[in-house]
C-alpha cells in the first residue's frame, strides 16, 4: 500500500501540488486525469520519492518514504513513464532484466530469480516472440509493453504509470490497461495510471482522481466522478455520455 497524506510540492517558491491525499490499495487501479499542467506527473514523482515534498507525508507499507533508501523504494515501487529510455541497442530480454538492478543485479550477473522474474514479465506482457529482438527495432506499442514488462520484473507491488499509453493507438492503449489490470488482480498489485482517455479510465479503473491547478478536486468510483459537470470543470469542454453496451460503464461519445 502507498498512501499520500496532505502532500504539497514546491518548485522554487511556487506550489505545484497542494494538499493531495490518496491511497493506492492492493488489487486496485487508480486513474489520474486532468488537463496539462494539473500536477499529475508531479504527484507521481512525489509518490515515488523522486521529488521532495514540502508538506504532508507519504507512507510505503506503513513506513515514511523519506526513511527508505532509493533501492528499497525501487524494490517496492515500479515506474513506467511515457516512451523514454527504451531505444537502447539491447534485446527485449536484456532490457527487461534491468528491472532487477534494484536487487544488485547487472548484465551478466543475473541469478535464477532475476531470470525467472524477467521471463514471467515477458510472458505476461505477450512479448515471448519478441524477446530476442533489439529494442531499436520495435514499434512504439511494443516498446511500451517492454517498459511495462521491466516494471513488472522488479516485482514491486506498486505500479506508477505516467501516461504509458500516450501516442499509442486504441488497441495498444487497451492492451496496456488490460495487462496492468491482470497483474493487479492476480497478484494484488496497486497501480496509479495517468491517462487522458476518460473511457479507458471508466472501463478499467476502480477509482478516478481528477486534478486541476495542482489539487485533487474530485475522487471516487468512475461512475460517481465521470459525469458531464465534472468533465466540464476539469477540461473546459462539453461532452455527451452514454453506457458501454458490453460493460455498462460510462463512456464519452462526443466532445464539443
Q: Locations of the language-model features?
A:
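Conserved ABC transporter NBD signature motif
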Residues: 56-64, 73
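The feature captures the beta-strand-to-loop junction immediately N-terminal to the Walker
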Residues: 33-35
Amino acid at each position: 500500500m502507498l498512501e499520500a497524506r496532505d502532500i504539497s510540492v514546491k518548485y522554487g517558491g511556487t506550489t505545484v501540488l497542494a494538499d493531495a491525499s490518496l491511497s493506492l490499495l492492493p488489487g486496485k487501479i487508480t486513474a489520474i486525469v486532468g488537463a496539462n499542467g494539473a500536477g499529475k506527473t508531479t504527484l507521481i514523482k512525489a509518490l515515488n520519492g523522486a521529488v521532495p515534498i514540502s508538506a504532508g507525508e507519504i507512507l510505503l507499507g506503513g513506513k515514511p518514504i523519506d526513511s527508505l533508501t532509493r533501492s528499497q523504494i525501487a524494490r517496492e515501487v515500479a515506474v513506467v513513464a511515457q516512451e523514454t529510455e527504451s531505444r537502447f541497442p539491447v534485446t527485449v530480454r536484456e532490457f527487461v532484466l534491468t528491472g532487477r538492478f534494484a536487487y544488485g543485479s547487472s548484465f551478466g550477473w543475473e541469478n535464477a530469480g532475476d531470470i525467472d522474474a524477467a521471463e514471467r514479465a515477458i510472458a505476461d506482457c505477450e512479448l515471448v516472440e519478441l524477446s530476442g529482438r533489439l529494442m531499436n527495432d520495435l514499434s512504439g506499442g511494443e516498446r511500451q509493453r517492454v517498459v511495462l514488462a521491466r516494471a513488472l520484473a522488479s516485482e514491486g507491488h506498486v505500479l506508477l504509470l505516467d501516461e504509458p499509453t500516450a501516442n499509442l493507438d486504441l488497441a495498444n492503449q487497451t492492451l496496456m490497461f488490460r495487462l496492468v489490470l491482470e497483474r493487479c488482480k492476480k497478484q494484488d498489485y496497486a497501480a496509479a495510471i495517468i491517462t487522458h482517455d476518460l473511457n479507458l479510465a471508466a472501463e478499467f479503473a476502480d477509482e478516478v482522481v481528477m486534478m486541476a491547478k495542482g489539487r485533487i478536486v474530485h475522487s471516487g468510483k468512475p461512475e460517481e466522478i465521470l459525469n458531464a459537470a465534472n468533465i466540464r470543470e476539469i477540461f473546459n469542454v462539453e461532452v455527451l455520455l452514454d453506457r458501454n453496451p458490453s460493460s455498462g460503464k460510462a463512456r464519452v461519445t462526443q466532445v464539443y
